[in-house]
């Protein structure tokens, strides 16, 4: 209970909502004695407050508050609640729950103007008959987001709870506002709509749907009410603003809870009120609003006056209502029309047609002289009417008086009488008004449909309340029937479903029958041969009248149905023809005019004029009306069956059934409106009236079940998640605990009453109020946790601040110490000297540093300029990419919203599917009810015949009557026997077709037979009771006549007593036999149900496994689709690669014509080449990731196939076992069926005999008792009636036990529905998981996009470098064209190499395409299989398919982005190759350039240029050093980039593993959810045939998959052989390369020896010794740098050896390089021979050697580049690390030897010339480089060999796995074929059984028709006997009156 401060938020409404604290304190302090204060039954006020004065002798003396003394029985005294419970807000919390306590609580609250009160789960509201300030905006804000217990009772609280339930439970809600007419339903409906429009407003007032909208959606929803009330509300006897139509307003909300749209459905407009009203009533408000003259332009427009009495149609009752201001209401209506967007033309047409209806009532007609035909009496009114309707007045009058009627194929003009014309005018008026109203509703719905995305809706139902008028017609019957159905829905929801929920969840609960079943009255109205059925039947007969309709009602129901009675005649009251006992009271109905109202005929000639009217609205209203003329003109148009005769009652029932279906799909919230008094007096309450409504509405029963039961329930998982915070230690982290056990531990650890909750199978149930307590405890716990968290955070922040303060303190101390020390020494002389000298010491060094810094500054400035330009360019690209990224994000966001909408629509469809399944079950139950009714009617006919025979014959003919009854009994027994056989056969067929899963046989044997027998007994007893009561009345009125027959009765009495004793003895024997048979039958039924459940469990397991197979196959299809997309992407990449290879070849042809390039450009190209290699590594890593994913998927596929094979084996074994058990069960079932049939037959016979004898015994006993009572002055009548009442109560108890059995039988169905709901929740969770997976995919897409952007930048840089290289090539082309001619042969060789590479690439592309084609075929087959397997799911989940389509579209978008990325990577790869080719050609051009320089130097041979040459070479060496320094920097940068890439790669691999684990979890969850759903879907009848087709297709698919696996295995074997051949070739090539390298080393040593001998003769070279030493130092540094570069290249090799596809090509290139090295060795040998033969040509030989060395260097560098490419392809071969270490040591030793020899060569070369020494040193360095490159290539070749060995092992393992899979699939195919054969055999058996049952059914149908003929004959005899009985009764009444 909130305090006064908390209630201040409600403003002035607070006193009207809740008691103040002062009042509560005063109530608690009032004196109260629980023993004496009480309520007592009072004849005046039903109940009165009083005090107990005394109690003695079974009587209690009570003194009331008005000082009256009453003496009553103890059962008439009720306990009173303590004063603190006065005006309690929830009556379920009352200590003593009884009728007076509820009544006085409502009365006390009503006196204080607190009109809303909770009553358990629903709300009760009392009409205040005055305005209260409880609907203001402050009150709306006060209730927004409040829980029910946090705010006082109010309609806003109910609305907010429904709104919150919709958001949290994601379920449609409904608010049912019910009550009698005048109880305030319409007002509360408007308040609900006001609340939703306020709290869920869209928030954008400026946004309009289109140009038609004059207001926001909230304004339009609110404005719809005034317009509908104006045209659909009217004053009645009990209500000034009564809704004369029903409406169901659906308010739709979007995903965020904002208003999305709304729509309105209307039901049964009371159109008869347009032309007729009672005296105390009036017509619809719109007529009087128009006549109020608030808008004079309407008076002129409609040609009317302001006096309502000028218009008979609207002035038959009252014309003014005190509580309604028609003038203001007209303004509100007109404003609503504008807000709702009606066009001016539509608005004008609306008013015109309303005015035309008023004018219709003034049209007068008279009879022609000497004729019966009518003619117009004046045309003025007709002219006005025709003007408003856009017609010709003469045509209108002619059509009314002389309509055209179709006779045969011709039309004739028929004359009408005056009465006929008036009836036609009335019908047309009502039709125009009704169609106008329906069009208006449709137009409002169009305006409220905003096309915004919807998610859920809240429906508000406002139906006309229960009506009891003086004159009640067909409209009142429809309204009251609707309220009867709604009350039945309420009872079922509150009492039946609630208790069935307890049973289903396994909670200990005793079923309570509250006696609220309204089925009798509902069946009387709507069932076959009910009131509506007879009404429609009479409407089909042309000569039927209201009297014939009344007679049929009497014949069918009078005396047979307790709810149908003949009304009592009351003087001064309108004549009534029959009475119905409704839940709210007895209503007298008059059938006058019912046939005409139901048929609703119209003058078709006038309707034809309407269709051609110039008033567009009128023509539109009747555009679809099918007249006879239209039918004649459109003979070929197909007409819907029955459309020509759609009665009002049939349309009403159709709409009502639709409404009930809508309500069943929602979560209802009930609001019960109460009328306090009949006089509309504010504050007054009539106890009897309110008590009657409370009893009828089930308020007390609802409170009881709320108190006794467990109204609050939560799923275990939700409870664990929400309330775990109460005691987290009870549920430890990191440990799996079942949700149910966790909830049990959690609740056990909390200090609450453990009797206040129960644990069900899936939920935990709470008593009323306990959940609120838990919420308060949770809020307190959260407050403590948040407070503690805040304290920890604040402490941490302060500690951080303290540490900063301490650091500042220490810094200050340090600064102070240094300053003090400086101040102490700054005046010291030596320190001054130090200050002066120190700057001078650094001046020289500073100048050098300044010079260096200036140079660096200039370089930095240039680089800054370049970087600035590049930065601007990148910024522009960044802006573009950011824009693209934003667009993509918007697109992804839109797609995600659409995805969520599609998921919600999918959920709604699934729910709709479940609802349809529930409807199917209901239809089945209805069919069973129909069969029961048929049996009931047959039994009733038989009893009527017995009755008639008894009345017809004298008591002396009792034996003849018994014989006749026996004969009819045997005939009926035969009929029941046939029907029983038919039902048993049908049940067996249904059970087999649904895999014997439904326990219909049990329901048929145990429930239907027993229920039918017991209901027959109960009906016979009730019939007996009514008959005896009637006989009592007759005997009382004819007592004197009975005295005359006393002598005869005495004689018959003695005879009957003898018969009675015999009958009693036979009855006892029969009852004993019946009990024994019942026990045996129940035992057999129990055994059968156990066997049936066991079979169903086994079959369910089989279906689950089969569905799991289907789901795995669907998953395989998805994986194959992904593989196919990957393969397609690769094929595209390969194609682009081939294109780039051709372009590269063209560029190579052009570049080979060019000359050399400088060493600076070479270094730049090396740098670019390194960048290209990095980008290519990234590309290859991405490719490897894709390949790893494919390999993982394949492995998963193989594992899944293995599991499937094992499961299929298990299934086969289980199936065989089940089939064996099934055959055994079938035999047992047949035996049991035969025994049950025999038992049921004997049971039925015995029961028939028993009932007959009971009837005879009861009649004899009644006659005997009546005789005795007449002799003893009726003193024994009371005791006899009490005895009969006891007997009936015993029978009612038996009926209750039967009902409890029925509830248990229904429990299975409700449990299935609950399981489906649970599965739906699990599927929602799975979809949420998929949404998370989608987000991760989007994240991957973003990463790929970023990678794409980086690659775009790299591409741009490559293009710039390429353009620069092309410009340089163009410069050198003109200079070295002559050299290009000499290199034609080399060009041809390069072309051959490129051609060979192209051919290999094409072969690989063809192989990939072949695989893609194979996978495409496999995909198509799998798709076909999946489409067939999932046909049932797709039928129910069409929107889910749309969702999947959207997902695939999104995947395509991702694939496109991946494709773009791969294209860019392919472009980079091509550019990389192009750059390598350019680098190679640049090396060649450089060599040519150096050769030309050497030749120039040789021709001149001038010694004077030697020193200049040395200087030039020195400068070149310095430049090379700088270049080496730059390369060192670039190497370090590349190492950093390499480390970053490695980290990114590791993160990507971790993310991939995480995603794979997530996918596995999702797959498992999906498999579980889908298996559960499929298990339920598999219960449908059509599943057997579908499974047969599916298994056949599965066999075909498996066969295709087997073929595909065989082909893939062959392909793997072929690849294995090819790889083995390649490996052998690689080994041979490597051995050749090793030998050639050894030979090269040997040749090199011999050349060096020769150089030593030669250099001994070069004495003049001693002058350059110092220079050579310097050069030697430079060479050493260069060697160290080259060694570091070797290490860098080795690291690069280890990072980039992953691309497998180009291995074969690179091996071929290696072979070619070996051949080139062989050629180089040959040239070296030739050089050696030249040196030995001719020392005089030493100079030329040295130059030749230098040229050859340069060529070798070029080839070596090319070999290094190619080796790097090959190493990128062979990364996975890391098993050779030990071998690499050994090779590394050998190489280091070789380098040392070469270095030592180089030193010796330099010492010997001192004697030679400078030029020769310099060239020889150059040659030595080049040979060293060549040797190192060759060693690297050898090492890399060994790596490649290891890699291919491991690859061969992997392929071998994969081939073995494929072989195993093939064997498993073959076994699977064999087993499935066997299964298909068995299913075919079962199908044939089912067909045979169906034919047998069809024959039995036809036979039973024939016998049924014969029985119906006999029943008709008996019915005619009954009618005759009734007539005789009436005559006999009337004669006895006359005699009685004469005696009196």
UniProtKB/Swiss-Prot annotation:
Q: Which gene encodes it?
A: Myh3
Q: Which domain of life is it from?
A: Eukaryota
> Which portions of the sequence form the region Actin-binding?
656-678, 758-772
> Which protein are we looking at?
Myosin-3
Pfam families per the UniProt record, alphabetical: Myosin_head (PF00063), Myosin_N (PF02736), Myosin_tail_1 (PF01576)
Q: How does it assemble?
A: Muscle myosin is a hexameric protein that consists of 2 heavy chain subunits (MHC), 2 alkali light chain subunits (MLC) and 2 regulatory light chain subunits (MLC-2).
What residue stretches are annotated with the Myosin N-terminal SH3-like domain? 33-82
Boundaries of every Myosin motor domain copy: 86-779
Q: Which residues form the signal peptide?
A: none
The record's family statement is: Belongs to the TRAFAC class myosin-kinesin ATPase superfamily. Myosin family.
Biased composition (Polar residues) is annotated at: 1269-1282
Write out the annotated subcellular location.
Answer: Cytoplasm, Myofibril
Please give the residue ranges the record annotates as the region Disordered.
1260-1289
Cite the IQ domain residue spans from the record. 782-811
Q: What is the lineage of its organism?
A: Eukaryota, Metazoa, Chordata, Craniata, Vertebrata
For this UniProt record, give its keywords in alphabetical order, as a comma-separated list: Actin-binding, ATP-binding, Calmodulin-binding, Coiled coil, Cytoplasm, Methylation, Motor protein, Muscle protein, Myosin, Nucleotide-binding, Thick filament
Copy the domain comment.
The rodlike tail sequence is highly repetitive, showing cycles of a 28-residue repeat pattern composed of 4 heptapeptides, characteristic for alpha-helical coiled coils.
The Gene Ontology biological process annotation of the record reads:
ATP metabolic process; muscle contraction; skeletal muscle contraction
Q: Which residues carry this modification: N6,N6,N6-trimethyllysine?
A: 130
Q: Which residues form a coiled coil?
A: 840-1933
